[in-house]
Amino acid sequence: VINHMEPDHTGAVEWLVSQYPSIKIVGNKRTIEMLNGFYGIADNVVLVEDGGELSIGKNRLQFFLTPMVHWPETMMTYIPEKKVIFSGDAFGAFGTLDGGVLDTQILPERYRDEMIRYYSNIVGKFGSPVQTALKKLSGLEINAICSTHGPVWTVPENIADVVNLYDRLSRYDADSGLVIAYGSMYGNTEELAEIIASEAARNGVKSIVMHNVSKSSQSDILRDVFKYKGLIIGSPTYNSKLYPGVESLVSALDNRFLKNRFFGYFGSFSWSDTTARHLGAFAEGMQFEVITEPVIMKQGMLSDVEEKAREMGRVMAHKLTSGAGVVPTIYPTQAINNKK
């Protein structure tokens, strides 16, 4: 049974067919098309449809198509007699399994951040299809989740936590914390980042993560952005554009349709400011609540710029500690379109 055609899952299919020529390969229509496309295998295939069932003696296999979680052919296979679901990449996690495979053999909390990192990097773009898949599976009684990445979840509390985490992530819900991601060439933009962070901490934000995009892995930055509701991005002007690492991060967030965030942005320049324009355009394209005017430093730190940075930290802290919901900022062009 092929739940997912990505080569990290199907790389052994050709070998299996060579060793067992009469083997039957079970998949849905898109799977069988890809099987032929990737490996030239078209014989001995068994086509199944959404909600279909296949008897294998004492047990049955039930198939649930979950397209775009995170490829178009993805599906899950459920064994009702055992109440076990083979979920493909869904509910997956990064991280090695060092000895134990079952959640009873490991420390489950070790994999929570790795599950968020996996979701944000691999599945993060597909929040709506994940929600559709969760609704489709909501009526199943599940004793074990067997993902293709990470531990096998068998403890009822762990199963509930895993499903709840995917539900929250796919709704872009997040914890009350702050991510500050920035690029800096000479230290000026970094100084602004540190001022904002210290002021947010003074005003009650206890979960603050700072990422220098030149030093942090983007994989880790994406994890934290999906984890926390507050996001502030800073960049110097670089050849009339954003700092390359910041530009890459902004592109990655836009590609994942991130929403439901309190957002601020800041930057620095020497003679021509384009940071505000580029980050402002990014903010306008996302469903963020922009908390203050951008903080922009020309050449060096002045007292008024420092105070604006502190104000950004204070306002973000108030948003995160007050329990307020995100209200997406309406821009003039959007307001005109809404009236139409």
Where are the regions a protein language model picked out?
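Structural motif
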Residues: N59, K83-F86, A144, G177, ...
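FMN-binding flavodoxin-like domain, especially the glycine-rich phosphate-binding loop
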Residues: L97, V101, L107-C146, G150-V152, ...
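Short acidic active-site motifs
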Residues: A12, S216-I221
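Short, charged N-terminal beta->alpha structural module
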Residues: A181-R202
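Catalytic core of the metallo-beta-lactamase
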Residues: G40-Q105
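Terminal amphipathic helices with adjacent charged low-complexity linkers/tails
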Residues: A144-D175
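Active-site metal-binding motif and surrounding structural segment of the metallo-beta-lactamase
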Residues: V1-I25
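Active-site neighborhood of phospho(di)ester-bond hydrolases with catalytic His/Asp-centered motifs
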Residues: V1-M5, I25-N28, I85-G88, I145-H149
